[in-house]
A protein has these predicted regions:
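Beta-rich nucleic-acid/ligand-interaction surfaces
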Residues: 1, 65-69, 105-122, 171-175
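Residues forming anionic-ligand binding surfaces in small-molecule and nucleic-acid pockets
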Residues: 10-29, 60-70, 249
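Helical (often loop-to-helix) elements that flank the catalytic cores of nucleotide-handling enzymes
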Residues: 11-13, 79-96, 123-155, 257-262, ...
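A short glycine-rich, hydrophobically flanked beta-strand micro-motif that places a catalytic Asp/Glu
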Residues: 58-59, 101-109
Length: 431
């Protein structure tokens, strides 16, 4: 039984507590079946979501005890944002009906994994063509390579802004740990696409694409399994996964609107700059080839296929000049830089005044959230813990007297009483 002190209506996370003897180390919850009570809750959630047009599709256990995941079917960005808000409201409401509490805080319990969102983002034309579909021969797909390198340029140029879009007080407890992507923005492409980019940079031309091949299981009785040419790399904050990018930094309580506004706008800028070059070109094929190579070379530093959790990557990112923005307070200024203001005003997304207003609101929200947590901790300590400790000191004092009267050494009890009394004095001075 987990025993922690929590006031969800105040902070959404535990402020004091102790780890139970067993946490998530056995992975038995992650790989286990959904418990009947949770399955009943999820069934009702699905029904309520389907009623209002949210296509909830899958649900499964996650790593931490009592942690679960839900995934809807893809939709256009503005609709998906609304759907996500409805999902969060529905989860909370249905949980109460089942006698449970749905915690959407990014780190509700210390010592076990927190929660986040995976924002699966792609670009599709009005006639249904996915611009991020590499096809079977990515090295020959000029349209895909141009779109890909434009995205690399956008993410490299505006990494600070993309990091800011996922800034949240709760995310400060989660990002960079071995459960979530690091606070350093990088792009994972997978072996196949990274090889194509390397060919473009080293030789000026991509002539082939790596194939996935077959996965050798070592068991003769099993059929051969097709091996994908790429991978998911869950340590990456912005990973290419087949025909889309997966932005994994968004906090579990946050709206996905900010992340998608930033992604759409920075990529629109990269597209616009590419258009300015290509529309003036006399030889379009030569110009697009040179532009793809130029963008690949200029933005290669943002590509990283390795372990984002490792300390080696932090040092490598610093060597590459990539920003490592560790907290929300450090991230907010990115919203009001001259670069950001120019970007958003150019495309009519936000004015300078609107950006400054949003930055001010975020500063205020952060300060209030931290202040509420601090005041709640003080309130809990004064009204719950200190009275309980004082009561315990009386019990210890009575025990010391009783043991001494029995003619037995009471030094252990006396020493414990003295230590607790000293702690109480420090607490009194701090108050």
């Amino acid at each position: 039984q987990r025993q922690m002190c929590i006031r969800d209506s105040y902070t959404g996370r535990t402020l004091f507590g102790a780890m139970p003897p067993k946490g998530q180390e056995l992975d038995d919850h992650y790989f286990g079946t959904i418990r009947q009570r949770i399955a009943a809750f999820m069934r009702d959630v699905n029904i309520e979501l389907w009623k209002v047009g949210v296509s909830s599709k899958t649900q499964h256990n996650e790593v931490a005890p009592a942690q679960h995941e839900l995934a809807p079917i893809y939709a256009e960005a503005n609709i998906a944002v609304d759907h996500n808000q409805i999902v969060m409201q529905t989860l909370k409401r249905i949980a109460c009906e089942h006698g449970m509490k749905c915690l959407l805080h990014e780190k509700p319990f210390a010592g076990v994994n927190g929660s986040g969102k995976h924002d699966n983002w792609s670009i599709t034309t009005d006639d249904g063509i996915n611009m991020l579909d590499p096809g079977t021969t990515p090295h020959e797909n000029i349209q895909f390579l141009l779109v890909l390198t434009c995205i690399l340029k956008a993410v490299n140029k505006h990494a600070d802004l993309l990091r800011e879009s996922a800034a949240d007080p709760g995310n400060d407890h989660r990002l960079g740990a071995n459960e979530a992507p690091p606070a350093i923005i990088s792009v994972f492409l997978g072996e196949q696409l990274e090889d194509v980019i390397d060919q473009l940079i080293s030789t000026g031309e991509a002539t082939h694409s790596l194939e996935g091949g077959k996965l050798e299981t070592g068991v003769r009785t099993l059929p051969e399994l097709t091996k994908d040419a790429t991978d998911r790399n869950r340590t990456s904050p912005f990973a290419f996964t087949g025909n889309k990018f997966e932005f994994r930094m968004v906090g579990s309580r946050d709206s996905i609107a900010s992340a998608n506004i930033v992604l759409n706008t920075i990529v629109a800028e990269a597209f616009a700059e590419a258009c300015e070059v290509l529309e003036k070109a006399d030889d379009f094929q030569l110009a697009v080839h040179d532009l793809i190579k130029e963008y690949a070379m200029e933005n290669q530093r943002i590509i990283f296929n390795g372990d984002g959790y490792s300390e080696a990557w932090v040092k490598e990112a610093e060597r590459r000049g990539l920003p490592n923005i560790k907290s929300m307070v450090e991230a907010i200024p990115a919203m009001v830089t001259e670069k950001a203001v120019t970007l958003f005003e150019r495309f009519g997304v936000f004015t300078k005044a609107e950006l400054e207003s949003r930055a001010e609101i975020q500063y205020e929200s952060y300060a209030k959230a931290i202040n509420i947590e601090a005041r709640t901790m003080i309130d809990m300590a004064r009204k719950q813990f200190i009275p309980a400790v004082i009561k315990y000191t009386k019990t210890l004092a009575d025990t010391v007297l009783a043991v001494k009267e029995a003619g037995v050494d009471a030094s252990v009890q006396a020493e414990t009483l003295e230590e607790i009394t000293v702690c109480l004095l420090y607490t009194s001075d701090a108050a």
